[in-house]
């Protein structure tokens, strides 16, 4: 924001010339103290890291920070070697933590009986557990785990946020989500989460913010039929018509009317996982999910009653690549999926 920076520079020069009040407290003519004072007033905003850097030094600093972020992520790849928390077995009624994934797009997929299904690709990028909160410090019912997804640049993050991630030994994340868990599903902060946390054949719930459509009428927003195009109709073709009766003398709350459409959080329940790619951490879920491409979505085990008992066959509390389990193949498929390399026609 060059306008804000120019205004701050002018204000610093004016305050630096003052001989009493704030200018005397900070030292007359001392612009460095003035800048520190102004930055202290805006501690929640991004840092001006490139203020005293030349154009040649900016790429060097960015590369240096990028290498440091990669080293921090590599140090967290083996959480079981660094004094892990005790791992408890699965019990009926247990709730695991979820993931934060990036929506890549959609593609077709075929089953062995020839049916075509459209799936959405969700990629897990640098997803880590950030904080554990016991149920005594939460709502008294369930514990929570804070999970961060997708590493972002630290140059535009506030100092207080950077301090939180520095204590964890992780680079800052783009978004943080909270998941309710049971006590036996607690995971140590700093543990990475992978797409193998889920398995093909299970069902998940996906939450994301829908695409904003702006202010829309009732035909687009609610699917109203509209009114006749001819036969004396004037300027009412796409209008809702009557919104109430004359007896009540008011409009009932919740009546479908024009308004802002989209840009709200929605959840798709009971989406089947058809395929898992362990190399690129991609989850193939059935159907569409809310949000645009490259948006971050929240994925967790389905809470529908029909799928609650499927958790006993899943990695609990999560998948550890350095655990006792055998190494997973690059692709995991549901038993009904026709694999890309399999023949399309077979003869009995």
Curated annotation (Swiss-Prot):
Molecular function via GO: RNA binding; structural constituent of ribosome
Q: Where is the transit peptide?
A: 1-40
Q: What is the name attached to this protein's record?
A: Large ribosomal subunit protein uL3m
The text of the family note is: Belongs to the universal ribosomal protein uL3 family.
Q: Which compartments is it annotated to reside in?
A: Mitochondrion
Query: What gene makes this protein?
Result: MRPL3
Q: What are its GO biological-process terms? A: mitochondrial translation; translation
Name the predominant localization. mitochondrion
Q: Which domain of life is it from?
A: Eukaryota
Q: Which disease is it linked to?
A: Combined oxidative phosphorylation deficiency 9: A mitochondrial disease characterized by failure to thrive, poor feeding, hypertrophic cardiomyopathy, hepatomegaly, and psychomotor retardation. Death in infancy has been observed in some cases.
Q: Which UniProt keywords apply?
A: Disease variant, Mitochondrion, Primary mitochondrial disease, Ribonucleoprotein, Ribosomal protein, Transit peptide
Q: Gene Ontology cellular component?
A: mitochondrial inner membrane; mitochondrial large ribosomal subunit; mitochondrion
Listed under subunit, the entry gives:
Component of the mitochondrial large ribosomal subunit (mt-LSU). Mature mammalian 55S mitochondrial ribosomes consist of a small (28S) and a large (39S) subunit. The 28S small subunit contains a 12S ribosomal RNA (12S mt-rRNA) and 30 different proteins. The 39S large subunit contains a 16S rRNA (16S mt-rRNA), a copy of mitochondrial valine transfer RNA (mt-tRNA(Val)), which plays an integral structural role, and 52 different proteins.
Is Cell wall biogenesis/degradation one of the keywords?
Answer: no
């Amino acid at each position: 924001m060059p306008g804000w920076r120019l205004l701050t520079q002018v204000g610093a020069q004016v305050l630096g010339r003052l001989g009493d009040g704030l200018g005397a407290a900070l030292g007359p003519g001392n612009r460095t103290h003035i800048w520190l004072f102004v930055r202290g007033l805006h501690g929640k905003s991004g840092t001006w890291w490139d203020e005293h850097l030349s154009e040649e030094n900016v790429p060097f600093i960015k590369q240096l920070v990028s290498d440091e972020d990669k080293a921090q992520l590599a140090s967290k790849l083996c959480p079981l070697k660094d004094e892990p928390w005790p791992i408890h077995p699965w019990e009926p009624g247990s709730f695991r933590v979820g993931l934060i994934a990036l929506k890549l797009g959609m593609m077709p997929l075929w089953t062995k009986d020839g049916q075509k299904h459209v799936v959405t690709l969700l990629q897990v990028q640098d997803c880590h557990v950030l904080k554990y909160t016991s149920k005594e410090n939460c709502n008294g019912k369930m514990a929570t785990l804070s999970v961060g997804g997708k590493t972002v640049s630290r140059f535009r993050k506030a100092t207080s946020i950077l301090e939180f991630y520095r204590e964890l030994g992780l680079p800052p994340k783009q978004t943080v989500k909270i998941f309710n868990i049971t006590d036996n599903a607690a995971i140590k902060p700093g543990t990475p989460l992978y797409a193998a946390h889920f398995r093909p054949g299970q069902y998940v719930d996906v939450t994301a913010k829908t695409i904003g459509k702006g202010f829309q009428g009732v035909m687009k927003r609610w699917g109203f039929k509209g009114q006749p195009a001819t036969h004396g109709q004037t300027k009412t073709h796409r209008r809702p018509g009557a919104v109430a009766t004359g007896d009540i003398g008011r409009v009932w709350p919740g009546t479908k009317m024009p308004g802002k459409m989209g840009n709200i959080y929605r959840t798709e329940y009971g989406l089947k996982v058809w395929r898992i790619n362990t190399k690129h951490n991609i989850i193939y879920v059935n159907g569409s999910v809310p949000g645009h491409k490259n948006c971050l979505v929240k994925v967790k085990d389905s809470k529908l009653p029909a799928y609650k008992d499927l958790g006993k066959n899943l990695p609990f509390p999560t998948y550890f690549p350095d655990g006792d389990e055998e190494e997973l193949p690059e692709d995991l498929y549901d038993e009904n999926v026709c694999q890309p390399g399999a023949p399309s026609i077979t003869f009995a």
